[in-house]
Design a protein with these regions (language model features):
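A glycine- and charged-residue-rich anion-binding loop/surface
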Residues: 2, 9, 14-568
């Protein structure tokens, strides 16, 4: 991306030349600044957490650093800096409805593992914001923990901030801890965006819930150990963990209203408008769809580039939900046919400077998006028709809740996910009996389990598996990795060994090495996706046969997969 790109964004209301630095420039400036302070600049970690089952997706700059902070691993250097790609979906229902919510963001951070502490951290933060970026010091306000006198002295005496401009807050705002373990106070830096973003109240100041004073950088000082009972002792090794949202910084530097107006997001947002043939800021309902698609296609692109595939569970389901929400809102805007890959191309163009792997994997990303859109388009039209009929019946009966049985019918028969049913109905003032849905789901699972025991896995004839060469085995590596490449060793339909499977066929795929856990020991097997650039296979169950063979039972969603193909 070139600096000129930061000046091409415009809204439907007015043309506005963006000020100073683009997102890619800010990222580069931050990393280079901390490299000049002796930090090792690491590339962003994958969105898939490594050896951390507490997280579904990386959601902060600190998350991949946990092994270094806990001492489980030795950091490559005591001073490290990163720009970490992150996904948070806790507020997914609000994405699009407001201009402040999003699922994808980048977190700038500098970290010290037993090296420098408060003085350097705060002075460098101030130096970067005021001298490197050039923000007005008079619009910056630090906050500290109530009794953190050390931080106060640094801000007041070393940096020269008047005492009345330093705000003291309690534990809820300025102390970082999660139960027992390392913890400590933090110091945040706020930026005053001006009266037009304020609430108008006479007491509006730092800490107000309005959009005038926004927190842009948080410095966490890990200096205590909490024993879990409220007793704190000083840590021998004190650490620094800081975080600053790149997109939020860009809104300030570029003097724009929201994260959807910063240069890279604005270019993507404008592409959405171009593809849909609509304008931004003309109609609020249209704006919701524009913002949602902008956010979701960006998140989806980054998730797929990290090897996450659309599935019905875990992080794969997060991806599937993002793609399908974007696809549905594209239809609401009047877009015909597949369009997400075209938008993903804009994501890649805007972010490849910082994430070159996007360019390297773009064809794979496009294939996954197209396959998922194709699969979704087969279900959504019929599902919407059936849901509309159910709505009419509820309206006639003056009911406000869709029964769990009907919601499950949409899911089981027409492939209509519960969250999509909920979203559509909530827009019209209805709700769903989720408890009833779960009961119907459990009944179906029990019936399916009983049927499998009678008919030998998904209806397949056991003699098909008996024909497989006894020398064929599968290495299970799911404890260490959730996704990797492997070679196909055997393929079957429900009745015979085959050399390939094509779209619409049911069958079983065996590979050399798999991350899929098989049904055994009372635990359900994994589901997911096996794919190549030419085809996608939906794994509906994983079974384990004699001799250590793991069979992935399911159906071809699109394209073709052949024996000896390298799949992911």
């Amino acid at each position: 991306m070139t600096p000129a790109r930061a000046s091409v964004c415009q809204t439907a209301k007015e043309e506005k030349i963006l000020k100073k630095y683009g997102v890619n420039e800010l990222r580069k400036m931050f990393l280079e600044f901390f490299e000049s302070k002796g930090h090792l600049a690491l590339k962003s970690f994958s969105l898939v957490p490594q050896n951390d089952k507490s997280l579904l997706l990386i959601n902060s700059g600190m998350a991949p650093m946990k092994p270094y902070f806990t001492g489980a691993e030795i950091p490559p250097r005591k001073r490290v800096t990163t720009c970490q790609k992150c996904i948070r979906t806790g507020d997914i229902e609000n994405v699009g409805k407001t201009a402040r919510h999003g699922t994808f963001f980048e977190m700038l951070g500098n970290f010290s593992f037993g090296d420098y502490f408060k003085s350097e951290s705060l002075r460098w933060s101030w130096e970067f914001l005021t001298e490197v970026i050039g923000l007005d010091p008079n619009r910056l306000y630090p906050s500290i923990y109530l009794d953190d006198e050390e931080a106060f002295e640094i801000w007041n005496k070393e940096i020269g901030i008047p005492a009345e401009r330093i705000f003291r807050f309690g534990k809820e705002d300025n102390f970082w801890e999660h139960g027992a373990g390392p913890c400590g106070p933090c110091s945040e830096i706020y930026y005053d965006r001006g009266e037009k973003y304020g609430c108008g109240k006479p007491d509006c100041t730092v800490g107000c819930d309005c959009d005038r004073y926004i927190e842009i950088w948080n410095n966490v000082f890990t200096q205590f150990e909490n024993d879990g009972e409220g007793h704190y002792t000083e840590l021998e090794q004190k650490n620094i963990d800081t975080g600053m949202g790149l997109e939020r910084l860009a809104t300030i530097v570029q003097e724009v209203d929201s994260i959807f107006d910063v240069d890279t997001n604005c270019a993507l947002r404008n592409k959405v408008c171009e593809v849909a043939g609509v304008e931004y800021l003309k109609d609020e309902k249209t704006d919701v769809s524009i913002r949602l698609i902008t956010d979701h296609v960006k998140s989806s692109t980054f998730m797929i580039s990290d090897g996450i595939m659309p599935t019905n569970e875990g992080r794969g389901y997060v991806l599937r939900r993002l793609i399908r929400r974007a696809a549905r809102h594209g239809r609401l805007l009047g877009i015909k046919g597949n369009f997400l890959a075209k938008l993903s191309e804009e994501v890649i163009e805007g972010s490849k400077d910082g994430y070159p792997e996007l360019e390297e994997k773009k064809e794979f990303i496009f294939n996954v998006l197209n396959n998922e859109e194709n699969q979704f388009s087969k279900t959504i039209d019929q599902g919407l028709k059936i849901l509309s009929e159910m709505e009419n019946k509820m309206r006639e009966a003056k009911e406000k809740t869709l029964s769990g049985e009907n919601a499950f019918k949409l899911y089981d028969t027409y492939g209509f996910p519960l969250d999509l049913t909920k979203e559509i109905l909530e827009e019209k003032g209805y709700q769903v009996d989720e408890e009833g849905f779960q009961k119907s789901m459990e009944i179906q699972r029990t019936q399916a389990r009983d049927a499998r025991e009678v008919s030998n896995y998904m209806g397949a004839d056991a003699t098909v598996y008996d024909e497989i060469d006894p020398a064929v085995t599968t290495e299970f590596a799911g404890y260490d990795h959730l996704s990797f490449e492997s070679a196909v060793t055997v393929m079957t339909t429900e009745t015979e060994l085959v050399s390939s499977l094509v779209e619409g066929q049911k069958g079983t795929i065996f590979v050399e090495k798999t991350p899929f856990y098989a049904t055994m020991g009372g635990q359900e097997g994994d589901t997911g996706v096996i794919s190549t650039p030419n085809g996608t296979f939906q794994v509906e169950e994983t079974i384990k046969l004699r001799g250590g063979k793991f069979g992935h039972v399911g159906h071809m969603v699109s394209g073709m997969i052949s024996d000896q193909d390298i799949v992911k």
